[in-house]
Amino acid sequence: MRVGVPPQIPRPSLNSAPSPFNPQGQSQITDPRQAQSPPPWSYDQSYPSYLSQMTSPSIHSTTPLSSTRGTGLPVITDVPRRISGASELGPFSDPRQFPSISSLTESRFSNPRMHYPATFTYTPPVTSGMS
């Protein structure tokens, strides 16, 4: 059995009938917006003229004039020398600060799984078959 191609029916062109999307006989909608005036600057302006409008940055010295600030407070680098007993300071130097830390290292929890309850088997509730 041989299958042939059915003859093509000529289709009308898309623009032959007026459609609501392409109304004929109506004038174009005029744009109510006014033309904007050009900005006071121009893209054609060269870089040197841009740079000439800026002032040159002033250079400041980074060295302090004295070791005390304008408020009269000492500079931070002077503070550690003024603390009495600075060499004795260390993290957690007082054992009374965190008394609960020692309880974490007790020997009754040598095995980390011992404080959990024993394993249990799960039995799902019995339900009737598919109904």
UniProtKB/Swiss-Prot annotation:
Chief location category: nucleus
Localization per record: Nucleus; Cytoplasm
Record's signal peptide: none
InterPro entries cross-referenced by the UniProt entry: AML1_Runt, Runx_central_dom_sf
Residue ranges annotated for the Runt domain, each copy included: 1-10
Post-translation changes: Phosphorylated; probably by MAP kinases (MAPK). Phosphorylation by HIPK3 is required for the SPEN/MINT and FGF2 transactivation during osteoblastic differentiation.
Keyword annotations of the record: Cytoplasm, Differentiation, DNA-binding, Methylation, Nucleus, Phosphoprotein, Transcription, Transcription regulation
Residues carrying Asymmetric dimethylarginine: R11
UniProt keyword tRNA processing, yes or no: no
GO biological process: cell differentiation; positive regulation of osteoblast differentiation; positive regulation of transcription by RNA polymerase II
Region (Disordered): 1-75
GO MF term list: ATP binding; DNA binding
Gene Ontology cellular component annotations, sorted alphabetically: cytoplasm; nucleus
Subunit field text: Heterodimer of an alpha and a beta subunit. The alpha subunit binds DNA as a monomer and through the Runt domain. DNA-binding is increased by heterodimerization. Interacts with XRCC6 (Ku70) and XRCC5 (Ku80). Interacts with CCNB1, KAT6A and KAT6B. Interacts with HIVEP3. Interacts with IFI204. Interaction with SATB2; the interaction results in enhanced DNA binding and transactivation by these transcription factors. Binds to HIPK3. Interacts with FOXO1 (via a C-terminal region); the interaction inhibits RUNX2 transcriptional activity towards BGLAP.
Biological role stated in the UniProt entry: Transcription factor involved in osteoblastic differentiation and skeletal morphogenesis. Essential for the maturation of osteoblasts and both intramembranous and endochondral ossification. CBF binds to the core site, 5'-PYGPYGGT-3', of a number of enhancers and promoters, including murine leukemia virus, polyomavirus enhancer, T-cell receptor enhancers, osteocalcin, osteopontin, bone sialoprotein, alpha 1(I) collagen, LCK, IL-3 and GM-CSF promoters. Inhibits KAT6B-dependent transcriptional activation.
Protein name, as recorded: Runt-related transcription factor 2
Source species: Equus caballus
Lineage of the species this protein comes from: Eukaryota, Metazoa, Chordata, Craniata, Vertebrata
